[in-house]
């Protein structure tokens, strides 16, 4: 009788627990599947007129008027000698990038954004910027920066109603890249490969790096201690695959298969679009400057010189977007 009672009790417990287990799994699945970027409705341009800027060098947080902050970004990220429509495009891109960070809560717990270009956007104060320009250029240069920000006030780039993650870089080397090809992860539909003409006339277009064989081996071993290469054998360095934008996706070096992005990081190359020439020394010939995702700054300047306005420049580099007033 006692055994029958225990059996019935166990059966009741099993019947009770099974629905709970399945319900928990379903709840977790739904949370993951409904994760989305925050919509534009979460940001009120009139209400949030200030931004909290983290200064990486000091660790201090400064609160600034948003458009005052953007003046420091535009004059730091793009040469004032560039065409006015390129500067306007940079202002809209910077404003969009900033608002995207505010809405989606960036990496910094107590600040909206930082002044490190490798993490967020570069920034410099007006006083510092003016001191770095020659006295004869200061007034005209600052007027161009102010015009770029003020004439585009409140304008941002949106895709399907939401601010985009507006990546930009210095020089695409003739073609931009998808975000997935560079960082993996999310595929942003507005960050596609597009062509740009006229970038080869800029100093950022090409560069070289020459290292000894010993330094080449040493650099890679810093990241991969098991690295082996025999330069006396053929095909010790072989490009296996290119990205759609023409950068190296995968490359075989000795006993390793590495990504072009990793080689770029190891040797601090300006781009993942490169060739390697092996002789007594190793020569990297590099095309472009930066990750290649989103707007090319020199490409924007080239397009402006060809008569394109800032909205045309933006819509060229960001596929299927709209310019929206907030």
Regions found by a protein language model. Give the residues of each.
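Sec-exported extracytoplasmic/periplasmic mature domains
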Residues: 75-79, 92-104, 154, 221, ...
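Hydrophobic alpha-helical membrane-insertion segments, chiefly the h-region
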Residues: 13-23
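Soluble non-cytosolic domains of exported or imported proteins
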Residues: 61-64, 81-92, 210-214, 290-294, ...
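C-terminal soluble interaction/assembly domains
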Residues: 259-326
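N-terminal Sec-pathway targeting helices
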Residues: 1-13
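N-terminal, intrinsically disordered, polar/charged segments of Gram-positive cell-envelope systems
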Residues: 23-63
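Acidic/histidine-rich, surface-exposed loop or edge segments in extracytoplasmic proteins
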Residues: 64-83, 193-204
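Extended substrate/cofactor- or partner-recognition/assembly subdomains adjacent to catalytic sites
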Residues: 100, 104-282
């Amino acid at each position: 009788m006692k055994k029958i009672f225990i059996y019935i009790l166990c059966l009741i417990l099993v019947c009770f627990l099974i629905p709970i287990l399945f319900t928990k799994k379903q709840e977790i699945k739904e949370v993951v599947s409904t994760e989305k970027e925050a919509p534009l409705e979460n940001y009120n341009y009139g209400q949030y007129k200030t931004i909290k800027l983290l200064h990486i060098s000091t660790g201090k947080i400064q609160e600034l008027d948003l458009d005052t902050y953007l003046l420091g970004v535009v004059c730091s990220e793009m040469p004032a000698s560039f065409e006015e429509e390129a500067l306007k495009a940079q202002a809209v891109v910077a404003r969009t990038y900033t608002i995207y960070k505010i809405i989606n809560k960036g990496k910094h717990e107590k600040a909206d954004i930082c002044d490190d270009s490798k993490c967020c956007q570069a920034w410099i104060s007006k006083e510092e910027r003016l001191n770095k320009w020659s006295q004869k250029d200061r007034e005209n240069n600052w007027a161009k920066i102010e015009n770029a920000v003020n004439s585009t006030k409140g304008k941002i780039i949106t895709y399907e109603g939401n601010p985009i993650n507006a990546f930009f870089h210095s020089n695409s080397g003739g073609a931009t890249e998808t975000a997935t090809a560079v960082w993996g992860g999310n595929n942003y539909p507005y960050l596609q490969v597009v062509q740009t003409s006229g970038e080869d006339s800029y100093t950022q277009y090409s560069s070289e790096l020459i290292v000894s064989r010993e330094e080449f081996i040493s650099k890679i071993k810093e990241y991969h201690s098991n690295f082996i290469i025999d330069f006396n054998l053929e095909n010790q360095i072989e490009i296996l695959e290119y990205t759609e934008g023409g950068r190296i996706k995968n490359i075989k070096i000795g006993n390793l298969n590495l990504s072009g992005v990793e080689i770029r990081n190891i040797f601090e190359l300006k781009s993942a679009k490169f060739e390697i020439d092996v002789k007594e020394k190793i020569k990297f010939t590099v095309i472009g400057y930066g990750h290649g995702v989103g707007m090319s700054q020199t490409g924007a300047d080239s397009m402006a010189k060809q008569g394109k306005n800032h909205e045309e420049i933006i819509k060229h580099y960001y596929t299927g977007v709209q310019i929206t007033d907030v």
